[in-house]
Curated annotation (Swiss-Prot):
This is Adenosine 5'-monophosphoramidase HINT1. One of its GO terms (cellular component) is cytosol. It comes from the Eukaryota. It is an enzyme of class 3 (hydrolase). A motif (Histidine triad motif) lies at residues 110-114. The modification N6-acetyllysine is found at K21, K30. One of its GO terms (biological process) is positive regulation of calcium-mediated signaling. Residues 18-126 form the HIT domain. It comes from Mus musculus. Homodimer. Interacts with CDK7. Interacts with RUVBL1 and RUVBL2 and is associated with the LEF1/TCF1-CTNNB1 complex and with a KAT5 histone acetyltransferase complex. Identified in a complex with MITF and CTNNB1. Interacts with CDC34 and RBX1, and is part of a SCF (SKP2-CUL1-F-box protein) E3 ubiquitin-protein ligase complex. Interacts with SUMO1, SUMO2 and RGS17. Interacts with the Ten-1 ICD form of TENM1. Interacts with CALM1; interaction increases in the presence of calcium ions. The lineage of its organism: Eukaryota, Metazoa, Chordata, Craniata, Vertebrata. It catalyses: adenosine 5'-phosphoramidate + H2O = AMP + NH4(+). Changing H114R: Reduced interaction with SUMO2. Its main location: cytoplasm. Changing C38S: No effect on desumoylase activity.
Amino acid sequence: MADEIAKAQVAQPGGDTIFGKIIRKEIPAKIIFEDDRCLAFHDISPQAPTHFLVIPKKHISQISVADDDDESLLGHLMIVGKKCAADLGLKRGYRMVVNEGADGGQSVYHIHLHVLGGRQMNWPPG
């Protein structure tokens, strides 16, 4: 977790990201789901037994810059996350998280939905 916080503190908005490279298939990822609007894949640094990300193919750097036109797409990410969680056997529950900005732990400036499960989640999370 400390490593993720360190990454978030030095991450900068703007420019191409690792997620853009994954969308374009320039670098490999363990893809769970893909359609014309989004991509779901396993996190390379899992924080739970099951930890995957759902990202839009449209570049939106962070939730604070999303606008009303993005509403359907952002909802679609949650529905895809729910379906992937079911496909991966997360029957007892899971957590969906979107990090916003450096203080919120955002380490990649391409909005992404974390889905974590396979263990009891703690509260508060941070």
